[in-house]
């Protein structure tokens, strides 16, 4: 076999050597410089189409929106299909001398559409006071907060995540009020006058950053004359302009909070009583309204609960569930004097109710605590 020792491309090599001087002359000429700059500009324009602009380390959101004729600056166009991936949140703990700092995210609840203005699912009474001891706003954090005397929020943010179609009509608003005792807005004018407010369509995600300060406040674990001294404020979610009462989205709360001054646990069970010497204790998980024939227990937060009711009554007919599920129960009656009802219930949305029915209803003692379905209330 013969081995090739010569370069068969000598003709091409000679042609390349002859072309190099011509290319150099073209590159230094005016036309060559113009061609070079045209190529640079072309590369820059192409890069803008694929690389998002960065300003101050943050993504320029204007590059993510679809241009629509007639749309004003800052408006959002309804997408064909888009969703938020919600992943599990891992709590982060940082210990220092005399304090512990916690960063976490929690689900506050699911909210439904409404035609008229509905705030906090129709539950009144400053439902979402910003205090770690408020089990309605901080169902997970409250179990830790009950072991401390003081707190200070470092960051706090509300996030609305839609779960409805992009054809859903209406509005969703989330707001912050510095005064935890102010009444909820009763109309759209009052809502629009909120200093800290985010409004959006039901299908569009919304976020509201709550202003925080560097003030240590006390936990709300007992009766307080002026709640303004212990609460950072209150937040709320309002819906209006919708076609029905279907679910539109979830509300999440993100926070970093520091706890100070450990104490014996203040308890996790809500106790409500009427009568001479009565005393309420624990977190406010429910509201109670009673007449001579009915006692209605309204839940302020979703979850699974163990409910124990003892009430004076002439007769006891039973318990009616309203927008909640009975998992297990046991009822007993002492004819003509009182009844006892123990229930394990699952509450999907704020405002769900249990209605106790009978005659001659009087004083009661009600115990409510968060539980699992396996905490059965059945008498075997």
Curated annotation (Swiss-Prot):
Chain spans, region R domain, interaction with RNA: 1-98
**Molecular function per GO:** RNA binding; structural molecule activity
Which cellular compartments is it found in? Virion
Region P domain, projecting: start-end pairs: 260-380
The superkingdom listed in its UniProt entry is: Viruses
A Gene Ontology term for the protein's cellular component:
T=3 icosahedral viral capsid
Q: What is the annotated role of this protein in its UniProt record?
A: Capsid protein self-assembles to form an icosahedral capsid with a T=3 symmetry, about 32-35 nm in diameter, and consisting of 180 capsid proteins.
Give the similarity note. Belongs to the icosahedral plant coat protein family.
What's this protein's name?
Answer: Capsid protein
Q: What is the lineage of its organism?
A: Viruses, Riboviria, Orthornavirae, Kitrinoviricota, Tolucaviricetes
């Amino acid at each position: 076999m013969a081995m090739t020792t010569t370069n068969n491309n000598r003709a091409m090599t000679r042609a390349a050597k002859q072309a190099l001087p011509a290319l150099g002359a073209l590159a230094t000429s005016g036309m060559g410089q113009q061609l070079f700059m045209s190529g640079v500009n072309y590369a820059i324009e192409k890069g803008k189409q694929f690389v998002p602009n960065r300003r101050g380390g943050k993504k320029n959101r204007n590059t993510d929106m679809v241009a629509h004729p007639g749309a004003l600056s800052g408006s959002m166009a309804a997408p064909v299909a888009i969703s938020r991936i919600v992943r599990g949140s891992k709590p982060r703990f940082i210990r220092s001398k005399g304090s512990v700092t916690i960063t976490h995210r929690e689900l506050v609840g699911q909210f439904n559409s409404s035609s008229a203005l509905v705030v906090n699912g129709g539950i009144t009474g400053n439902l979402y006071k910003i205090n770690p001891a408020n089990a309605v706003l901080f169902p997970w954090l409250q179990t830790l907060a009950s072991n401390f005397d003081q707190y200070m929020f470092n960051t706090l943010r509300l996030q609305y995540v839609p779960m409805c179609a992009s054809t859903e009509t209406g509005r969703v608003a989330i707001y912050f009020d510095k005064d935890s005792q102010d009444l909820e807005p009763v109309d759209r004018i009052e809502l629009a006058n909120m200093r800290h407010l985010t409004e959006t369509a039901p299908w569009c995600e919304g976020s509201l950053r709550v202003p925080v300060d560097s003030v240590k406040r006390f936990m709300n674990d007992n009766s307080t004359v002026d709640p303004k001294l212990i609460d950072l404020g209150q937040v709320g979610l309002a819906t209006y302009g919708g076609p029905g009462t279907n679910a539109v989205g979830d509300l999440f709360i993100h926070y970093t909070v520091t706890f100070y001054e450990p104490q014996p646990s203040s308890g996790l069970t809500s106790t409500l009583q009427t009568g001479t010497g009565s005393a309420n204790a624990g977190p406010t998980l429910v509201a109670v309204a009673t007449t001579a024939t009915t006692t209605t227990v309204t839940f302020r937060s979703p979850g699974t609960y163990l409910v124990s009711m003892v009430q004076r009554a002439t007769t006891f007919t039973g318990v009616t569930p309203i927008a909640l599920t009975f998992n297990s129960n046991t009822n007993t009656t002492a004819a003509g004097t009182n009844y006892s009802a123990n229930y394990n219930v699952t509450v999907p949305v704020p405002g769900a109710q249990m209605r106790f029915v009978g005659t001659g209803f009087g004083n009661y003692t009600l115990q409510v605590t968060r539980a699992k379905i396996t905490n059965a209330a059945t008498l075997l």
